[in-house]
Amino acid sequence: MESYKKEFIEFMVDSNVLKFGEFTLKSGRKSPFFMNAGAYVTGAQLRQLGQYYAKAIYEHYGDDFDVLFGPAYKGIPLSVATTIAFSELYGKEIRYCSNRKEVKDHGDTGILLGSKINDGDKVVIIEDVTTSGKSIEETFPIIKAQADVEIVGLMVSLNRMERGLSSNASALDEIQEKYGFPANAIVTMEDVVECLYQKEYKGQILIDDERKKAIDAYYAEYGVK
């Protein structure tokens, strides 16, 4: 495993973002693990997170894009932190944009926060995690309703490696098939298991045999065939 992947997995654990237990996801699935980007709360955490995302986006999509779109609510700090990191690491000024859950009718009106989206813009979407592709069903129409844009791709931090909403393909593969743009992640759940299974980290084993059995059972039901 590449060293940066191991570092990022440990960063998620240290930030209390990656947890193990029993969780009900937005998709309705019961999962033995959960990733919550809302737990990144300090300046140091957000700075480091933005750098991980910026490096992954640069690796997969380069810097030929104009806007980084982070869907409300968790995508808002992700887009801000990553545009800052992009400027620091690569000297490229990317605009951030997010949506509001409710349209604002006074002052800075409309559905968007940050930059407006203009005809001809190239957009990268940034999210914490995509389980079933449901979130993109909500985000894609919002972006396309703003202007005639090209969506370059989607970047998430964790690929959960499970089926999407309507096929046996992974959620990320299903997004690419349905919407026509690539979807990538900093790390996969397979990377997480490889990194943590039966390996002590800071005095504890986060994935022991029992937890590995629960993860395997989850993928037997929801994993990519």
Regions found by a protein language model. Give the residues of each.
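Active-site-facing substrate-recognition patch
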Residues: M1-Y61
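PRPP-dependent phosphoribosyltransferase catalytic core
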Residues: E2-E10, P141, A145-K225
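Phosphate/pyrophosphate-binding loops at sites that engage ATP/ADP/AMP, CoA/4′-phosphopantetheine
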Residues: A54-F65, F140, K144-D148
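Short glycine-rich phosphate-binding loop at a beta-alpha junction
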Residues: D63-K74
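Structural detector of well-ordered beta-strand residues that form the stable sheet scaffold
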Residues: L68-F69, C97, V152, N184
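Gly/Ser/Thr-rich loops at beta-strand to alpha-helix junctions
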Residues: A72-L78, S132
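Short, glycine/charge-rich flexible loops or terminal/linker lids adjacent to PRPP-binding catalytic cores
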Residues: V80-V123, E137
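A contiguous pocket-lining binding segment that forms or flanks enzyme active sites
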Residues: L112-M161
